Amino acid sequence: MKIPIILTLMLFSLGFIFGFISINNLSKINDKDLSNYIPNIQFNFPSILTNNLKVIFLMLAGSITFGLSTFINLIFNGFNVGVLIGSISLTNEPLKLITALILPHGIFEISAMLISAVAGFKIPYKVTLYLLDKKEKPLTEEDIKDFLKLSLISIILIVIAAFIEVYITPKIATYLLT
């Protein structure tokens, strides 16, 4: 289990660093050009939950794409978080803005994303061990149970994150920023 965790943290961090660094180049694009690339996501519970569940299921799909979908989406989402944090740092807004707008739901959302990525890498990792003759069976009942537990935990966390993002984060932000 250690290798999937390390791989997950390294790829997310790599994406984050590239996103954070590249925000200086992205900030040179004028708002009109940038508006074509910003997705139109409505700010309500079903929309936020659906969008976040897509990310979780793409991470989990790594179990059947031999880690490819997890790999791509982990770097992409790390990049997005890096761009978000980098763009906030460019605005010279106080740290409490970052805390108010990201931290309440971000703790659950990023945890869910990372846990689902570990799950998405777990099965390909176990199959690889089998192919390298380091395991007797490609998948054991325990491997499948672990995958399902991680999947369920990530889904529960993403539901909590969406709820907090829609119903609690705005109230915390309003309180801290007034």
UniProtKB/Swiss-Prot annotation:
GO cellular component: plasma membrane
InterPro entries in the cross-refs: SpoIIM-like (IPR002798)
Keyword Membrane assigned: yes
Cell compartment(s), UniProt: Cell membrane
Topology of this chain in the membrane: Multi-pass membrane protein
Superkingdom, natural source: Archaea
Transmembrane segments: 3-23, 56-76, 101-121, 150-170
Pfam families assigned to the protein according to its UniProt record, in alphabetical order: SpoIIM (PF01944)
Keywords carried by this UniProt record: Cell membrane, Membrane, Transmembrane, Transmembrane helix
Record-stated family: To M.jannaschii MJ0706 and Synechocystis PCC 6803 slr1478.
UniProt name for this protein: Uncharacterized protein MJ0793
